[in-house]
């Protein structure tokens, strides 16, 4: 019995040992299989990752095509930028700008001069009011101005002193090429102070008369550069400002009941400027412009004639000469980005006139004792040989 028990125990231990070895072998096999599967999966994922990072051959061709297109666009862009950089045409464009700028200054000075003389005449009454309109032409640039004026008479030691005020606004304008008013232009303002002994009924009229007149302008303009080949149409904004002062003495002399001759002499000062500005639109290479200004002191001498056609109609004319006592016309200066400075002395193109003639003719029709209608045409040569012509009509009521 004891041997049989020991034999069964030995067989049981052997069976348990074989079972343990089988389980261990199975675990090792499963672990090895799992390791191989994990390794294979890692390799597969690595290949997928590599495939994502490396573009296919077709994508490389597309990228090469895109690169060529980009190079063409870059070359085209470079060409587009280089086109405006035409130094010769840019300089010609600046010359045109200079000529038109000086013409605008002449135009504004002409309007100031006209307004300073537009104050109504009180005649033998105490005060007057008038409305007027006039057309201006200066070398293809033109404008229509409409205004009102008023004057009042004071008697100082039996000598009539007449003080007047006038306002002139723009109704229509075609300014020199490249210029236009920005919005509605502010009106011009004028004044006059006249010492008129002949208005005293006790005087025979043959006495020295004195006159002080003036006008002021301040307006905003938009300026567009002339377009030439391989240049740009740059645009900017600036201000035009200036004033006009005229002082003269005149001596009316009555030849007979029909004709009065009036010699006159005086001094005139005017100043007009266009502010500095830079182009802000329509350009890649902006131009920067320095202030352009002009001022003159002139001596004036001339003769006026008034002819009484009948009780209602009078004809008057005037002619004279202006001498430049001093005159300054600033050089036209501009600076183009990457091209540098341009400086234009306008004297090189048009030599200014040291003596300038002027003339006018007018007609006054007396509607009744208190009201009249007058027309006037005047002409003057500007400093740079532009002909400034004004034609106007007005109505005056005295009271």
Residue positions per predicted region:
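Solvent-exposed, glycine/polar-rich loop segments of beta-barrel outer-membrane systems
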Residues: 173-178, 220-237, 273-295, 326-353
